Amino acid sequence: MPHKVSLSRLKLTDFRNYAAVSLALDGRHAVLTGNNGAGKTNLMEAVSLLSPGRGLRRAAYGDITRVGAAGGFSIFAALDGMEGEVEIGTGIEAGEETTTRKLRINGTPAKTADELTDHLRLLWLTPAMDGLFTGASSDRRRFLDRLVLSLDPAHGRRASDFERAMRSRNKLLDEGRFDPSWLAGIEEQMASLGIAMALARQEMLGLLARLIEERPESSPFPSASLQLSGFMDGQFSRPSVDLEDEYAAMLAESRYRDASAGRTLDGPHRADLIVHHREKAMEAERCSTGEQKALLVGLVLAHARLVGNLTGHAPILLLDEIAAHLDEGRRAALFDLIDGLGGQAFMTGTDQTMFSALADRAQFFTVADGKVFG
């Protein structure tokens, strides 16, 4: 069983609808119930900001500060982390530039947010993801990249560096500046970063596929088959240096086409994650809404197990409205599967009775009007 990473305290100041709130946690799962709009998801968002990035809502930091506050917000968490007990503080101060947030680990300023992954891994599932299989391909790429990030924290830096290089290329092409040596340098950088991104995604899909293959057939959630499409399809068994050369050549040959289009038409930013319901041999987008939700739950749980297996530390799960559309039997099975992962989960819902099968495996909190009771 992986080591259990768990929060013991969470304190928020001027965060969303919370002027100040403090939760004492005992390592069990945490169930947050209350009316819609009470602030349950806000608490989940705060926990999600203990990982690199902008959290489960991807909100601008300036939008997170409580309306009516002087400005800024803070999050403090104490936890039994991957390297032992640790205290993490993050937020922005009044009047600060809001594109970045401050981060302190045990009171010391962190150099980058990637340092958070030394202490915990966070995975989440929210109602906003329910349309993942039918929505835009960019949503599926973002979902896959978060899966990769949980095991390869450098993936985020590669992706942002690729985007930056691509914007530089697009700007040169838009301005009609076809300097071959300048463009070639940018395209070589894009090729190195882009192929590394694509290979990391492919590796994640392979790891998940092997784990799903080993799953018992009696699982209450359907299994998914996964593949990438739209960039260098079927080519990734070749040496990476050959792939980089091919992609760089592709970019060089498509300069005038991309200039006319106003964007780069080939690259990992154009790939799509294709998901099938294995048992039905059906594309996920053609499955019923309930089947899509069950597929997504099964996929997130498989990934959580993979993270625990490969790191030796169970990830913390944030499961927003997870029980809303599951019958009683499937809810109970879900809670058992979450238990089997060996970690701590935060779950939300409007009705506490939907979580009764957890019994004493969880702490129960009631959320109302910017306050938490329990």
Swiss-Prot record:
InterPro entries: AAA+_ATPase, DNA-binding_RecF, DNA-binding_RecF_CS, P-loop_NTPase, RecF/RecN/SMC_N, RecF_2. Pfam families: SMC_N (PF02463). The keyword Signal does not apply. GO terms for molecular function: ATP binding; ATP hydrolysis activity; single-stranded DNA binding. GO terms for biological process: DNA replication; DNA synthesis involved in DNA repair; double-strand break repair; SOS response. ATP binds at G34, N35, N36, G37, A38, G39, K40, T41. The RecF protein is involved in DNA metabolism; it is required for DNA replication and normal SOS inducibility. RecF binds preferentially to single-stranded, linear DNA. It also seems to bind ATP. This is DNA replication and repair protein RecF. It comes from Rhizobium etli (strain CIAT 652).
